[in-house]
Amino acid sequence: MAKGVFITATNTDIGKTYITALIVKKLREANINCGYYKAALSGAEIINNNIVAGDAKYVYNVANIKGNPNECVSYIFKQAVSPHLAAKLNNVHISMDKIVADFNYRCNEHDYITVEGSGGIICPIYYDKEKIMLTDIIKKLKIPIILVSPSGLGSINGTILTLEYIKKHNLVVNSIILNNYDKSNIIHIDNKRILEEMTNLPVYTCEQYSEDIDIPLKELKQFYDFI
């Protein structure tokens, strides 16, 4: 039975893919069979007239995963817009059944599976007669969350609001990672302290351009839960 965790963030462009790649890399370098999955990706790359899931490609490259990165993403769209709008523009129906089936397939291939979300926690994945929000996917997959937040000014507000929304949907967050952390920046240092006190969650940091995630392997493994 595989163990899984879901990586989400306070907003888009916070560094989910970067953090996800470092987490998968750390586990794989410890000879742990860790895989990657993403339900929907927009803003894909076009390489030699072929659509490529850029986030997945990045994770594969950093974590040294062999194979076609497109295979670990259920829906891939060229337009750099929210998945629900990309689906509408391409007349594509996003199916929760397909997402769950693809996720389960990845779980059968790996002992640990790291799932990356789209955008921030409040992200519509499909918005037609049927509506799928990112939180609906997390509930279906039944895995805990690691929340990626910025380190600088505004981080406390964005992080606490995101946690409140997650709590409202009866989902579990087991840790926070502050991205682009500068250990000499008094704001970053204070934000980490305040968030630890306000949330009672472990708050880790990742410095800019780091090639490793500063989380002990034993603790990182504990953030994954059985699916």
UniProtKB/Swiss-Prot annotation:
Location in or out of the cell? Cytoplasm
The answer, when asked if Transmembrane helix is one of the entry's keywords, is: no
**Catalytic activity entry:** (7R,8S)-7,8-diammoniononanoate + CO2 + ATP = (4R,5S)-dethiobiotin + ADP + phosphate + 3 H(+)
Q: Name one Pfam family in it.
A: AAA_26
Q: Which UniProt keywords apply?
A: ATP-binding, Biotin biosynthesis, Cytoplasm, Ligase, Magnesium, Metal-binding, Nucleotide-binding
Q: Where does substrate bind?
A: S42
Q: Which InterPro entries match?
A: DTB_synth_BioD (IPR004472), P-loop_NTPase (IPR027417)
Residues forming the catalytic site: K38
Q: Which family does it belong to?
A: Belongs to the dethiobiotin synthetase family.
Please identify the protein, giving its name as recorded.
ATP-dependent dethiobiotin synthetase BioD
The organism's lineage is: Bacteria, Bacillati, Bacillota, Clostridia, Eubacteriales
Q: Which gene encodes it?
A: bioD
